[in-house]
């Protein structure tokens, strides 16, 4: 994606790492969509817009009815640790991916899944965000919010890493909303 080079280069740690290696940056950039033809197969690279990053794309393998979707979708598990920022921008990115014609999703950091698994993650995130917003508007502390959501979001406790990461997810969303960063 056309924004990737700037994001890659602005990271100090990345710059240090790159200074010790010969790195070839992308020489093809696109804004919204790039179509690859590989034999009789079509792969659409589609920008998901601003959110987790400004260069996040989904690879849509048209004939195989498969997408490769990284970082914004945790398939069959809760989101990683305190989640990324800004969390509210994940929802439009995920909805854009959902508009594609696919059956299988290949994530970057979770199990393979189906289209319904992406919908389930959207439901998880929207519920999490909404309930944290409600708790904050009621003046609840982070700790109170965590305890409330452990009960009110129990319908999602089937997700992997619930015990490890759910309270961290609540913490991340709470801090983003409290600090006004959830939709920046």
List each language-model region with its residue ranges.
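Accessory terminal helices/loops
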Residues: 3-13, 99-100, 112-184
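A generic fold-level signal
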Residues: 22, 40, 53-54, 165
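Proline-rich low-complexity regions
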Residues: 24-29, 79, 107, 148, ...
């Amino acid at each position: 994606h056309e924004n990737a080079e700037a994001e890659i280069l602005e990271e100090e740690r990345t710059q240090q790492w790159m200074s010790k290696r010969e790195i070839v940056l992308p020489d093809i950039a696109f804004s919204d969509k790039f179509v690859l033809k590989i034999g009789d197969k079509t792969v659409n690279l589609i920008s998901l817009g601003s959110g987790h990053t400004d260069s996040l794309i989904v690879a849509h393998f048209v004939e195989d009815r498969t997408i490769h979707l990284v970082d914004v979708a945790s398939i069959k598990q809760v989101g990683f640790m305190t989640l990324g920022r800004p969390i509210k921008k994940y929802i439009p990115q995920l909805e854009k991916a959902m508009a594609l014609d696919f059956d299988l999703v290949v994530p970057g950091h979770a199990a393979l899944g189906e289209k319904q698994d992406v919908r389930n993650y959207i439901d998880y995130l929207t519920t999490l965000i909404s309930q944290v917003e409600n708790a904050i508007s009621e003046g609840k502390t982070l700790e109170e919010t965590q305890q409330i959501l452990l009960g009110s979001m129990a319908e999602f406790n089937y997700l992997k890493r619930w015990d490890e990461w759910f309270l961290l997810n609540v913490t991340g969303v709470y801090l983003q909303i409290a600090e006004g960063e959830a939709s920046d």
